[in-house]
Design a protein with these regions (language model features):
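RNA-contacting regions in translation and RNA-metabolism proteins
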Residues: 1-43, 47, 53-75
Length: 75
């Protein structure tokens, strides 16, 4: 799942080398923290959070298939 978030984020930003995804798993729950360069933050979030919501929706679908809970944080 970490790789999927990283691929999606790198395709959106101008500085793909600054994209870092941290994964923290506890039991059946996974927290993915997406770090991007400050100037790319708006591109990852999108207008009214649409891009961020789309990323979270895709990850929720993947997590449902794998029977886990996933939270995507953009920091």
């Amino acid at each position: 799942m970490k790789e999927l978030v990283e691929i999606m984020a790198k395709s959106l930003v101008n500085n793909p080398s600054a994209v870092v995804v941290e994964e923290e798993t506890t039991g059946t729950s996974t927290v993915l923290r997406l770090h991007v360069a400050p100037e790319d933050m708006g591109k990852v979030i999108g207008k009214q959070g649409r891009i961020a919501k789309a990323i979270r929706t895709v990850m929720k679908a993947v997590a449902t298939r794998e029977n886990v809970k996933v939270v995507v944080e953009i920091v």
